[in-house]
C-alpha cells in the first residue's frame, strides 16, 4: 500500500480545507471520506459567513483556502450583516445552492495537485511509541502515513434524536464512527458529549408567500474570494415569518416529549443557536421568535426554516409548523432532529492543532468542541498547513489573537477549553478594529506566501492589489480642497484656511466614499473595494494607533517562546498548583502561559526570569 505524508480523515468543511492546504504545500495527501457526494456537505443551514464567521471565511481565502471561492460559485443571496454599525463588525454572508456548492467543491478537490481521495471508512489508527504510523480501514487494510488529521464532525459515536426515537448516525442516513471513538479512548483522550440540532425541511411549494415578509439580498453581491471578479449565480430572495402564541403553546404542551427536555440527551447544545424548545423556555416572556425561510437552491423547492431547530417528535413538528403564518399548509420533507457526538478537550492540542499526546496526530473542527462550518474550515486550514510543514521539517505556522479571528478561536480553545459548542463572535477579539473582513488578505496572504501555501495566481492578484492600494492612497492624498470651499458644499470642517485631502475628509463623521466620488469624479475609475478599505482605515486611524501599540506589546510577549523541555517544577517561586497547570497545558509562549486560568502575574515574571537565566535568550530549544 502506498505511503502518504498526510492523511485527512473526514471530508467535511475542516477536512477539505486541511487536505487542500496540505496538498498546496507539496506533500502527498490522502483524503478519506465515506461518500463522494458528501464532500463539503452542508449538514445544517445552507449558508456561509455571518457576523465574525464571514471574517473567518475571508481569512481562509487569504491563505488560499477553498470556502470563499466555492461559495462564490454557489451563492444565491448575498447580504452584508451589521452594515449599519461600524466596519469592524460587518458580517459578509451568503445563502448557498447546496447542489452547486457540493458540485464546485467536488470539481476542485478531484483535480487538486498532490491530493488523492479514497472513499472508505477508517476504523482505527496505528500508533507506535507515541507516533503516527498508519490508518486502518474497516476492511482491515492499513495505509501508512506520517501525519493524520482527524476531522470527524458529528460522526464520533453520533446519535440522532427525534422525540424518544434514537438513531445511531453521524448525519441522516450515514453511519457513525464508533471505532475512532474507541481509538481515542485507548490512546488516553477523555471524550465528552456535545449536541447540535437542525430544523425540519419544508416544501417551498406549500408555503403561502403572501403571509411572509420578503427579504432581498444586497443589490450587488460582494464576493468572498479575492479570486472572484463577479458573482454570476442567479440571486433570489429569502423570507421571514415568526412563531405565534399558538406555536409556543404546542411546544410547552409537548416539552416532556422533546429529547432535550426528557433527559434523553446528555450533551450540551450551542448557547447561541438554541432549539425552539430552548427559546420558549429560556425566553418565556417573548411572544414571538423570527424564522428565516431560506431556499436551498435556485431549482430546489426545499426550504430551510432557520430558527426552529428541534428534537420534538415528528408528529409534534407537524403541529407546530401549522401554527406559523404562511406555513399553515406546509409539508415537512424531513423532520428536524438533535444529534449528540463525542469531542475532546481542546486543551489537549497545541496552537498548531497537533495533539500533545501523539506526535503527528492533529484534530480540526467539531472534534475540538466548535460549531459552524466556518470555525471548522478555519481549523482545517491551520491543521493542514502545520501537518505538511512538519513533514517538511519546517517551523510551525501559528496564527495569533493579534492577526486573525482564526488565531483568536484557536487560542480560546487551547487555553480555556470549552464545555459547550464554541462559536466565533466579534466580541471575542480584543483587536477587532484591525482584524476585519475587508483586510484579511493584507493581514495573512503575505504570511501564506512566505511558507509556500499560496498559489501563483493568488500571489499575482495580491501583488497587483497592494500596488493599487499604494497608488490610490497617493491619489487620495493629492486630491484636496480648501476648508472654505468645503464649507460652501455643506461639509462641516474647521475653517483654518488649510487644504483637506480625501483621506482627511474620510475622518469626518458622516462623510463617506459616495460623497468623495461626487466631489472628485476621477474616483469613479478607482476600485471601490480599495476606496472602502482606505476609508475604513482613515475612519479608524486614531483608534488603530492605540490598538497597534497594544498589538506590539502582545507580539513582544508572543515572541518569548517557552522551550518544549522546560521543567516548571524547577522554578521554586511558582506554586505547585501553577506548576501543574503549566505542565499540563504546555504553553509555547509567554502570552499563552499568561492566558491559562490561575496563572498569576508573579508566576509569569518568575518564568521570564528563569528563561533569561537558564537559556540566556528567548529562543525555543
From Swiss-Prot:
> Which GO terms are recorded in the biological process aspect for this UniProt protein?
tRNA methylation; tRNA wobble uridine modification
* Record key words, sorted: Cytoplasm, FAD, Flavoprotein, NAD, tRNA processing
Residues annotated as transmembrane: none
Cystines in this chain: none
Q: Which SUPFAM superfamilies match?
A: FAD/NAD(P)-binding domain
Q: Name one GO molecular function term.
A: flavin adenine dinucleotide binding
Q: Which InterPro entries match?
A: FAD/NAD-bd_sf, GIDA_C_N, MnmG, MnmG-rel, MnmG-rel_CS, MnmG_C, MnmG_C_subdom, MnmG_C_subdom_sf
Mind telling me which GO cellular component terms the entry cites? cytosol
Residues that, per the record, bind FAD: 10-15, 122, 177, 366
**Which cofactors does the annotated protein need, by name?**
FAD
Give the subcellular location: Cytoplasm
Q: Cross-referenced SMART domains, in alphabetical order?
A: GIDA_assoc_3 (SM01228)
Task: Provide the residue positions that the database annotates as binding NAD(+).
Answer: 269-283
Q: Which PROSITE patterns match?
A: GIDA_1, GIDA_2
Q: Does the keyword Cytoplasm apply?
A: yes
Query: What is the annotated quaternary arrangement, including any partners?
Result: Homodimer. Heterotetramer of two MnmE and two MnmG subunits.
Q: What does it do?
A: NAD-binding protein involved in the addition of a carboxymethylaminomethyl (cmnm) group at the wobble position (U34) of certain tRNAs, forming tRNA-cmnm(5)s(2)U34.
Which protein family is it in? Belongs to the MnmG family.
Q: What is this protein called?
A: tRNA uridine 5-carboxymethylaminomethyl modification enzyme MnmG
Q: Which organism is it from?
A: Rickettsia bellii (strain OSU 85-389)
Q: Which gene encodes it?
A: mnmG
